[in-house]
């Protein structure tokens, strides 16, 4: 039997990159997966390619979206065993050039969106879970910048640091429901957020506005050299790290921040 056979999972930001790879990994290990993404076409395409998966596109920066997304997962599966809070993006700026809009946007998607998803899930848990329930899993995606900080990444780092606080607090609140809550803090992973914008500019549409995403070739090379392994991680590397926190073998691990950074420690 696959290790996640009979389990159900919600993965946010699952249309591309880490989220897509995670949805595929969990499904390959037996879980039924709800694929959430801002981009409806992408979410539908990913779900259609995963046996038994369900697509539910939604903009998680809409305060009303989280209740609807969690409700859709509960309706589709009759319960929810795994929540992976992955949705997010990067908006670079040094503090002297940072607008209130940039600050608010990074806190909104990385902290507030996770809070709302977990609040909705928590309301269901209080009615349906106990210490005798099968172990359920929450995995919140943070970043090494949320642990160590990062130049020109104040808002992003603050949002990802908030994820750490959310994780450690809910691990204490939800242990009595037999729910483990952990975070995975990634270093540089090869996604469109870290692809070279000199070669092919990547535009992400958020709330109807375009955001340029990506890194310079110089930044990409620096990220590779910072790792003792000499490379950036792949989405599959990231998904494997998340899977470990969803698997039965991690049932006694909670409240932890797992650094999956290729050995980068600053």
Roles of regions detected by a PLM:
Residues 175, 180, 253-255:
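Short, small/polar-rich loop/turn modules that mediate ligand/substrate recognition or access, typified
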Residues 118, 159, 167:
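Active-site helix of classical SDR
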Residues 123, 172-173, 251:
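Alpha-helical segment proximal to the catalytic Tyr-Lys
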Residues 3, 148, 241-243, 254-266:
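Short C-terminal tail/terminal secondary-structure segment
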Residues 94-95, 102-107, 212, 223:
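Substrate-binding pocket helix/loop in short-chain dehydrogenase/reductase
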Residues 143:
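Residue(s) in the substrate-gating loop at a strand-loop-helix junction
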Residues 3-34:
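Canonical Rossmann dinucleotide-binding motif of NAD(H)/NADP(H)-dependent dehydrogenases/reductases
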């Amino acid at each position: 039997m696959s290790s996640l056979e009979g389990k159900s999972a919600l993965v946010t930001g699952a249309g591309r990159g880490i989220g897509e790879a995670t949805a595929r990994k969990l499904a390959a290990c037996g879980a039924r997966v709800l694929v959430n993404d801002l981009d409806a076409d992408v979410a539908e395409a990913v779900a259609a390619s995963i046996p038994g998966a369900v697509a539910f596109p939604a903009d998680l920066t809409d305060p009303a979206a989280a209740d609807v997304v969690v409700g859709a997962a509960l309706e589709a599966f009759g319960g929810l065993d795994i929540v992976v809070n992955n949705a997010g993006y990067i908006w670079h700026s040094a503090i002297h050039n940072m607008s209130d809009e940039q600050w608010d946007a990074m806190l909104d998607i990385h902290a507030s969106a996770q809070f709302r998803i977990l609040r909705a899930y928590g309301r269901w848990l209080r009615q349906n879970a106990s210490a005798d329930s099968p172990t359920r899993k929450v995995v919140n995606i943070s970043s090494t910048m949320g642990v160590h900080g990062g130049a020109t990444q104040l808002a992003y780092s603050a949002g990802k640091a908030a994820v750490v606080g959310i994780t450690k607090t809910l691990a204490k609140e939800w242990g009595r429901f037999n729910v483990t809550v952990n975070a995975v803090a990634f270093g540089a992973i090869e996604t469109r957020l870290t692809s070279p914008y000199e070669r092919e500019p990547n535009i992400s549409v958020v709330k109807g506005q375009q955001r340029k995403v990506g890194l310079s070739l110089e930044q990409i090379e620096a990220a590779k050299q910072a790792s003792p392994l000499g490379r950036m991680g792949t989405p599959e590397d990231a998904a494997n790290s998340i899977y470990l926190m969803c698997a039965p073998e991690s049932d006694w691990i909670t409240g932890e921040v797992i650094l999956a950074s290729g050995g980068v420690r600053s």
